[in-house]
Amino acid sequence: MRFKKYFKIKYKNNNVYEHDLIHFGDFGLKSLGNCNLTSEQLTASLKAIKRVIKKKNFLIIKALPFWMLTRKPRDVRMGRGKGSPAVKVYPLKAGKIIFEFKNVNETLLLRALKSSSLRLPVPTKVVKKYDKRTDCIKSSW
């Protein structure tokens, strides 16, 4: 067997997990809901970001798909085992940071994240890193 067949994920609640912080960059895109984020949705939002910000080495992806979803073919009767692996997903929970950005102009970043969040299946918000020296509160738009 090439891929492990996992059980289906059941999301218990839609509470936003506030303790997921920005570690590497200055800004981040935080999810506000639960979903299975597919690799196609992730690449579509990445293309939308890179279309606006033409810089390299500015983006850190924290949500990489690792979970295989299985599907049975059409017109197949019930039973006879689990289906074959079809789609790779990332089980995204509310409050998790999807992308982190560093050394990027703030106005360009907001425009890029607005276009990329339209391609994601969950509502999102932009968060800023907490600075201990100036004691600034983490801001969000």
UniProtKB/Swiss-Prot annotation:
Molecular functions per Gene Ontology: rRNA binding; structural constituent of ribosome
Record-linked Pfam families: Ribosomal_L16
Domain of life where this protein originates: Eukaryota
Cross-referenced CDD domains: Ribosomal_L16_L10e (cd01433)
Biological-process GO terms, alphabetical: mitochondrial translation
PANTHER family listed in its UniProt record: 50S/60S RIBOSOMAL PROTEIN L16, LARGE RIBOSOMAL SUBUNIT PROTEIN UL16M
Keyword Ribosomal protein: yes
Subcellular localization(s) per the UniProt record: Mitochondrion
Protein name per Swiss-Prot or TrEMBL: Large ribosomal subunit protein uL16m
Family in the record: Belongs to the universal ribosomal protein uL16 family.
Entry's Gene Ontology cellular component terms: mitochondrial large ribosomal subunit
Matching InterPro entries: Ribosomal_uL16 (IPR047873), Ribosomal_uL16_bact-type (IPR000114), Ribosomal_uL16_CS (IPR020798), Ribosomal_uL16_dom (IPR016180), Ribosomal_uL16_sf (IPR036920)
SUPFAM superfamilies associated with the record: Ribosomal protein L16p/L10e
Keywords from the UniProt entry: Mitochondrion, Ribonucleoprotein, Ribosomal protein
Chief location bin: mitochondrion
